[in-house]
Amino acid sequence: RDDLVTGVQTCALPIYPEIEEIDVVEPDEELVEVCMKYFPDTARGLNDERVHIYHQDGLRFLRGRKGEYDIIINDSTDPFGHTEGLFTKEFYGICYQALKEDGIMVYQHGSPFFDEDESAFRSMHRKVYRSFPISRVYQAHVPTCASGYWMFGFASKKYHPLNDFDSKRWEERHLKTWYYTTNLHLGAFMLPKYVEDLLEQEEKENG
């Protein structure tokens, strides 16, 4: 299995023995050094021998790659400024091309809680929905993020996060996790009505 991460959040990946390669793309070399020094728990995965760090722009790194990755994890910052390119339809299309036939992309989706963030939230879903045959949004409580209520996106060429979910297969692996459970997996995709309405409106207008 080959994984690509934009950002430095790799701490959970090494527990999966089937992962062969992890490419981490982070243009800011100093940021990586600071994370490893002051946030060792968050950055501990960077020391895994399967991890390869590339200090360059994620869009430029992926452009031209075809069918190389099983999963792409986009842990970018907010959709403006120097990272704005990682929230464009072009970028999501490039991710689609870089994934294998059954590839998955997960990414931070912001929050619809505040009115000023709603337009970015809708725009992101619209672009991914147009780029992937399967596109779902899930939620988590992240106290360090604005409002504490944060959304993430799941996009795939083949697998649906609920219809293809096999809880028995997960339990049989006996992996020790700090946060994830099969019940949490199912619950994360159960969204509040106002969020469902926002997503459905974008899908109807762009279906």
What are these regions (language model features)?
Residues 1-11:
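Single conserved hydrophobic/aromatic residue that forms the stacking wall/gate
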Residues 12-102, 115-121:
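The AdoMet/dcAdoMet-binding core of the Class I SAM-like
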Residues 78-79, 110-114, 142-144:
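Short "lid" loop at the C-terminus of a central beta-strand within the Rossmann-like core
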Residues 92-93, 118-139, 153:
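Conserved Class I S-adenosyl-L-methionine
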Residues 102-109:
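Conserved beta-strand signature within the Rossmann-like core of class I S-adenosyl-L-methionine
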Residues 146-148:
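Short acidic/glycine-enriched loop/turn segments that link adjacent beta-strands
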Residues 150-207:
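SAM/dcSAM-binding transferase cores
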